[in-house]
Amino acid sequence: MKTTHITEQKFADLGLEPTVLEGLDAQGFHYCTPIQALALPVVLTGQDIAGQAQTGTGKTLAFLTATFNYLLLNPASDERKTNQPRAIIMAPTRELAIQIYNDAAPLLASTGLKAGLAYGGEAYEKQQKVFAEGVDILIGTCGRIIDFYKQRVIDLASIQVVVLDEADRMFDLGFIKDIRFLFRRMPAPKARLNMLFSATLSYRVKELAFEHMNSPESVVVEPNQKTGHLIQEELFYPSNQEKMRLLQTLIEEEWPDRAIIFANTKHRCEDIWGHLAADNHRVGLLNGDVPQKKRVRILEQFTQGDIDILVATDVAARGLHIPQVTHVYNYDLPDDAEDYVHRIGRTGRAGESGSSISFACEEYAINLPAIETYIEHPIPLSKYNSEALLDELPAPLRLQRTPRQGGNRRPNGNRQGQGQSRPRNNNRRHPQSQKQQ
């Protein structure tokens, strides 16, 4: 039975270079997602594209497939030097750059092409060594790429393919001047294949595309609704005093297999982490203060199931491919309505269902009208029974301390995942047909 997120378009029918198809087959990719089915037939002809689709729809595989295919069918010039990559893939964050590199691994193995990573937060020497040996594909963030360019570690004169991923996020983070700097150091747009992908093709993104690309064709996959039809949304109005107790109560009732909790500040994230760690949850923290190597390790632990809950600022809300996230909690409603969509888009991916639970607290309830206007529907409201919330919670741990192993309130002293923690209070939720006025 065909699932809703896969089309009838086969990769085998696209005329791909055999070793590219081999890499796709090795990972079980046989049918295209909608963005792949629309983008690949266009870009494989050599036409530049500007693609838009919801997160989790296969944008990364689309541009990786096109990049590898183009490089294999269009050999490098004889004048190319060792420090000149043939393709460059730019991402707004270190985490996304690493994710793209990991996603490229099967194609690297099947084609024999080489790739290198360039991002901040890690020592220069290790990355420099890779580029000194020569790579075909450069994947990285703009700041470190510019550093390497100015130090002559890399040269962009032989670039044949350019990919700009999460272009709208590039604007949000103020990287557009860096991108334009790099574009001006590459061959002219007509001398290379250019691909831009974004969650939204806003006016400023389109302007960038037409300025530095060769008449790109727009490829748009419109969602059924901005928040995704497989995501069950829910909203609570907690007081500031009950907010943490409500979160911990919901977590114990739901026992999410894999959850992300978003907060608006790093200090709030640390506070949430401290409460959950003290309660012996397997929880990780991801914010701007966490060293890069630790961030990578935390993401790996979360992806592999060694961590059940990830507490994060919006650094984790865009671009990362974390499979099977079952729940997203907006502990704080985001200030930007678009960030609400990107946050809850961590769940309900690739045809799976998911749950999004948001708190409209005293501090951030003011953001709710703009969010509901942007998503074009009210978030279903639920009430809760204050008397049913957990109490006598342990004091939160400080970030520098190691979470203790003993002293759990639950029977058997650990999470069993089979309803052994606390009976579900069926009176906790009282769904409302309309949002409170």
UniProtKB/Swiss-Prot annotation:
Domain Helicase ATP-binding stretches: 40-219
Annotated ranges, domain Helicase C-terminal: 245-390
One of the GO BP terms on file: RNA catabolic process
Translocase among keywords: no
Compartment annotation: Cytoplasm
Family: Belongs to the DEAD box helicase family. RhlB subfamily.
Protein name from the UniProt record: ATP-dependent RNA helicase RhlB
Organism: Photobacterium profundum (strain SS9)
